[in-house]
Amino acid sequence: MRILFVIDGLPGGGAEKVVLTLAAQFLRDGDRVSLISLRDVCEYPLPEGLDYQVVADRCRKPWRKLTELSRRARQLDAAVVRAEQQGQFDLVLSNLHKTDRIVARSRALRERNVWFCLHGVFSASYLGHRTGFDRWMKQQKIKRIYQGRNVVTVSDAVGRDLVEEFALRPAQLKTIYNPFDITALRAEAEADSERPDGDYLIHVGRFHPGKRHDRLLEAYAQSGIDAPLVLLGQGKPEQEQRLRQLAKTLHIDDRVWFKGFQKNPLPWIKGARMLVLSSDSEGFGNVVVEDRKSV
């Protein structure tokens, strides 16, 4: 079987890791696997045998945002046509909402077996801060993408949220929980690392408003806990700077350690006294499974 993953880059998030875990298993099963990344960013090692290509957008025109989706769909179409000279794709898995918006406009994939993979709770991510007409418009935009299409979600709650909050009906709606290679996970937890000695708390996740690092820092400041708080992750520089400034304002900057993205966070997780999770919502809390299975 020939399988294509499409994703908006591999910058080090949970969904990206899931995609590569699935790709590796398909390859072990003897399938031919391709991955098209829509950004030239990759923080993870790629599985051996993966056909990986980047279809990055080089447009720098002032009006590029107005034409982004249709332009990028054409770029994706060209890449798919080239790739299918070696055989048609039997299964196409689109991951992350921005990717889905582009794949939904693809002409080359219109007659393919396309599944849209949802990794998060959309109402929390896209409706939580919206009201009135703005909220209704966002609901309609999301509905247009997924209505009548094949959708797979990482938990039942993600699927229910999509149907109930956006009043849409997929052609097929399936739940497939995120995969974990438990044997490899436990081996990785034993690897050498630069984790600190002694007790510490840990949070693993990209710097994004939905992860609510602000709430985490405020709660940590109020807790009176002396053990340091280790933050593993990265994001936009301005977001990290805001968090660093908040730590200073709360007078905890000497106890909050920003350690960046770690390709293997498992030794850090295993060595922590406590794992903390502060997100507004999680489609599937990968790090919780990793924490429980790494000990």
Give the residues covered by each predicted segment.
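A short, active-site helix/loop in glycosyltransferases that binds the activated sugar's phosphate group
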Residues: 147-173, 180-182
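N-terminal strand-loop element at the rim of the active site
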Residues: 5-12, 17-19, 25-67, 158, ...
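Membrane-proximal helix-turn-helix segments that form the acceptor-binding/catalytic region
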Residues: 132-151
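A conserved mid-protein helix/loop that constitutes part of the nucleotide-sugar donor-binding site
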Residues: 16-21, 199, 203-222, 241-242, ...
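Short His-centered aromatic/hydrophobic patch
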Residues: 94-100, 118
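A conserved nucleotide-sugar
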Residues: 31-32, 213-257
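Short glycine/serine-rich donor-binding loops of glycosyltransferases
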Residues: 265, 285-289
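Aromatic "clamp/platform" in nucleotide-sugar-dependent glycosyltransferases that forms part
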Residues: 261, 280
